[in-house]
Swiss-Prot record:
The keyword Secreted does not apply. The gene is gltX. Belongs to the class-I aminoacyl-tRNA synthetase family. Glutamate--tRNA ligase type 1 subfamily. A motif ('HIGH' region) lies at residues 9-19. It comes from Acinetobacter baumannii (strain AYE). GO terms for cellular component: cytosol. The keyword Manganese does not apply. This is Glutamate--tRNA ligase. GO terms for molecular function: ATP binding; glutamate-tRNA ligase activity; tRNA binding; zinc ion binding.
Length: 502
C-alpha cells in the first residue's frame, strides 16, 4: 500500500508556522516511503473561513518550498479537496451511523445544554453531555423530525472501559471512555463537525498515516470509534510535539509572532525557516544544524522525533537565517534583497507617502526607513502623554489589536474606521489617540500617515509592532485580559446598552 499523508489547514486566519511544521514532517514522511503528500482545506467553519485566508496559506507553504501532489489548487483523483464542496458526502455517512445504531438524534437546545453543564459544575462534575437523546423513543424521534425540530446527530460512546490505540512516537496510548464525550457529528445547520469530516475524508482520500499535533490526542478515541463503526481501517497515528515559547507555554502570537508571512516580511529566507522548523524536535543523524529540505528528506526517520516540547526561539531562528545569508554569494544576496522588497505596488505606496515630505531623494531613507526595519527602537518613556493615562495607552493598543485581528479585509477604510471607532468609543480625541500608534508603528510621531503605514506594512508586521509596543508599556495580566475583553465588547454597544452591560 502506498503511503499517503496530508495537511488539512482551516482557512480562518493567517498562515501559522505550526501548520508549516506539521506539513513539513508529513511531506518528509511520505517522501521517505516513496509516497504522496496531499493538501486538503477544512473549511466547515463557514462563518470564519475565507478565500483570502486559503490563498495566504497555500502561497506561504509554496513560498517555503512545500509541494503537494493533490489539493484544491492542483486537483487530483479524490477531488474536491475543500470540505465545503463535499457537504453532501458527510450527511450520508452520518445517517448511515444512525441507521446502524452507532449515532442518535439530539433535540436539546443550547439553553438546555447550558443548564445541564451549570448543574454538573454545581455538583463538582466535569461538564459533559448526559446522553439525554438516547432516552427518546423511536416514535418521539420520528415525530420531532417530522415536525422539523432543530437537531444534531451525536455519536455513541462506551460508558466504561478504556480506549487503546497505537501512536508511532508514544506506543500504546490508553484513554478511559469516561473521558470521551458523545461528540456532535452533524450540526443543526446540517454541516459536519471536524471529527466526522476528518474521518470520512481521510478514508475516502486513502490516507495511510496521520501526523498531527499532540493537541489532537484526546480526539483519537472518537476517531478510532468512527472507523470501527464504519468498518474501515484506521490510518496509523503519530501525534507530534507542540511548538512552544521559550517559557515552555504553547506557541502563541501573544509571545511570539506565529504567522509565516511575518517571518517572510522581516527577511527570513524560506530555506532558513524550513531548516529551523525541521530542527523542532528532530535532528540530522550527524547533528549538523544547517541543512536543506532535500537533506532532511534523504535522512528522515520519524523515530528521531523527540517528544520534549520543541522551543520556537526567534533569536535562534535569526542566527540560523544569518548562516544561510552568509552562505550566499554577493550576487545571490542582492537577488534575495531585490526579491524581498520587489512588490511594485507596495513600493509605490511608500513613495506616495514620503513624496510630500522630501526635497532630496537622499531624504527618502529617513522617512521610509521604518517600512524596512524589523522593529522600531522604542522606549516606555516615548509613550508618556499629557492627554492619556498609562492605562489608556495600554488599553488602546490591546483593543486595537483585538479589533484589527477580526478584520479579514486589510485596507485603508477598515484600518482607519477601526481606529477611529475605538478612539470615539473610548472617549479620546483622535489627535490625542493617534500618537501612541505613530510611535508603535514608526518609532516617532513625526512620520508618514500612520493608518496608511499600517496598511502598507500589512497585518503581520502591524500586529508584531503593536504587540511589541504593548510589551514595552506593559502587557495586561491574565486577570486584566478577562476584564479588558469585557470592556472592549461593551464599548461597541450603544451607550445605554454599554451602561447596563457594565
Amino acid at each position: 500500500m502506498k503511503v499517503r499523508t496530508r495537511i488539512a489547514p482551516s482557512p480562518t486566519g493567517f498562515p501559522h508556522v505550526g501548520t508549516a511544521y506539521i506539513a513539513l514532517f508529513n511531506m518528509c514522511f511520505a517522501k521517505q516511503h516513496g509516497g504522496e503528500f496531499i493538501l486538503r482545506i477544512e473549511d466547515t467553519d463557514q462563518l470564519r473561513s475565507t478565500p483570502e485566508s486559503e490563498k495566504m496559506i497555500l502561497d506561504s507553504l509554496r513560498w517555503l518550498g512545500l509541494n503537494w501532489s493533490e489539493g484544491p489548487d492542483v486537483g487530483g483523483p479524490h477531488a474536491p479537496y475543500r470540505q465545503s464542496e463535499r457537504m453532501g458526502i458527510y450527511k450520508q455517512y452520518a445517517l448511515e451511523l444512525v441507521e446502524k445504531g452507532h449515532a442518535f438524534y439530539c433535540f436539546a437546545t443550547a439553553e438546555e445544554l447550558d443548564q445541564m453543564r451549570a448543574e454538573q459544575q454545581a455538583r463538582g462534575e466535569t461538564p459533559k453531555y448526559d446522553g439525554r437523546g438516547l432516552k427518546l423513543s423511536q416514535e418521539e424521534v420520528a415525530r420531532r423530525l417530522e415536525a422539523g425540530e432543530p437537531h444534531v446527530i451525536r455519536m455513541k460512546v462506551p460508558e466504561e472501559g478504556v480506549c487503546k490505540f497505537n501512536d508511532l512516537l508514544r506506543g500504546e496510548v490508553e484513554i478511559p471512555w469516561a473521558q470521551v464525550d458523545m461528540q456532535v457529528l452533524l450540526k443543526t445547520d446540517g454541516l459536519p463537525t471536524y471529527h466526522l469530516a476528518n474521518v470520512v475524508d481521510d478514508h475516502l482520500m486513502e490516507i495511510t498515516h496521520v501526523l498531527r499535533g499532540e493537541e489532537w490526542l484526546p480526539s483519537a478515541p472518537k476517531h478510532q470509534l468512527l472507523y470501527q463503526y464504519f468498518g474501515w481501517e484506521m490510518p496509523t497515528l503519530c501525534h507530534m510535539p507542540l511548538l512552544r515559547n521559550p517559557d515552555k507555554s504553547k506557541l502563541s502570537k501573544r509571545k511570539n509572532p506565529t504567522s509565516i508571512n511575518y517571518y517572510r516580511d522581516i527577511g527570513v529566507l524560506p530555506e532558513a525557516l524550513l531548516n529551523y522548523l525541521g530542527r523542532m524536535g528532530w535532528s540530522m543523524p550527524d547533528e549538523r544544524e544547517v541543512f536543506t529540505l532535500q537533506d532532511m528528506m534523504d535522512n528522515f526517520d520519524i523515530q528521531r522525533v523527540s517528544l520534549g516540547g520543541p522551543i520556537f526561539d526567534v533569536e535562534k531562528l535569526n542566527w540560523l537565517n544569518g548562516q544561510w545569508i552568509k552562505g550566499l554569494t554577493p550576487g545571490q544576496l542582492l537577488d534575495r534583497l531585490l526579491t524581498w522588497k520587489s512588490d511594485r505596488s507596495t513600493l509605490e505606496d511608500i513613495a506616495a507617502a514620503i513624496q510630500p515630505r522630501i526635497n532630496l531623494l537622499s531624504e527618502a531613507v529617513n522617512w521610509a526607513g521604518f517600512y524596512f526595519n524589523h522593529m522600531p527602537q522604542i522606549t516606555a518613556e516615548m509613550f508618556e502623554s499629557k492627554k492619556l493615562t498609562q492605562e489608556q495607552v495600554r488599553q488602546s493598543l490591546q483593543f486595537a489589536i483585538w479589533r484589527l485581528e477580526s478584520q479579514f479585509t486589510w485596507n485603508n477604510d477598515t484600518v482607519s474606521q477601526t481606529l477611529m471607532d475605538l478612539a470615539n468609543q473610548m472617549g479620546i480625541k483622535l489627535r490625542d489617540f493617534m500618537p501612541t500608534f505613530f510611535i508603535a508603528i514608526a518609532g516617532s510621531t513625526s512620520s508618514t500617515p500612520v493608518m496608511q503605514s499600517m496598511v502598507t506594512l500589512g497585518p503581520d508586521l502591524t500586529f508584531a509592532r503593536l504587540r511589541h509596543a504593548l510589551e514595552i508599556v506593559g502587557a495586561p495580566s491574565k486577570k486584566e485580559v478577562k476584564n479588558w475583553e469585557k470592556l472592549n465588547e461593551s464599548l461597541k454597544l450603544p451607550k445605554n446598552e454599554a451602561t447596563s452591560e457594565a
